[in-house]
């Protein structure tokens, strides 16, 4: 199984390849020691950036099998997971049939009114959406307080290993961006206090990787997952 959250997000775009993957196998990867470490590191970063409080409403755009969605629900949030793939949504519903609202939808045209959620998150999903700028605008539109969006980072060791030449394995066809390129997606949008953070500096997941993940500040822009967070105006 490939590294971190992008594996389950690779096929988010309409007509994309995620429909070829097995939802159960992807979700089970997070039960492995390496998968659990990577997923937890990413979740902790995104949760901190969102500044959530119990009882807040949160939308997970491109939720896939709902691994991150369930983690946010465990923190006492009122969570909605959105994904275009009905098979993956069915898997997510089976894992959590009552506490979370699961919605079929497209990131480029979110089926919610303006300012519907206190926070909005997306984890390595927009890298595979044809119009990322439109998807970002939609996330900002439905967020009432804060948002955090994770992308695959071109300025990372993971890119050197998996992203060059069009990408390999689960990363084939993904768009990789440098942090300054991502900030341009927010130009002209009603946002403030944009910040860049990253996680998973050494994707191998061994003891050295875990130690470095604890020691390095997440303000360094070199992790495999780069997150842009901010507030809506």
What residue spans do the PLM features occupy?
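A short glycine-rich, Lys/Arg-flanked "PGG" loop and its adjoining helix->strand segment in the class I
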Residues: 133-147
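Short alpha-helix
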Residues: 173-197
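A conserved beta-strand element that flanks and buttresses the S-adenosyl-L-methionine
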Residues: 121
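Class I SAM-dependent methyltransferase SAM/SAH-binding core
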Residues: 65-109
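A C-terminal cap/extension of S-adenosyl-L-methionine-dependent methyltransferases
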Residues: 194-233
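Conserved class I S-adenosyl-L-methionine
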Residues: 4-53, 55-64, 67, 146-173, 206-207, 215-216
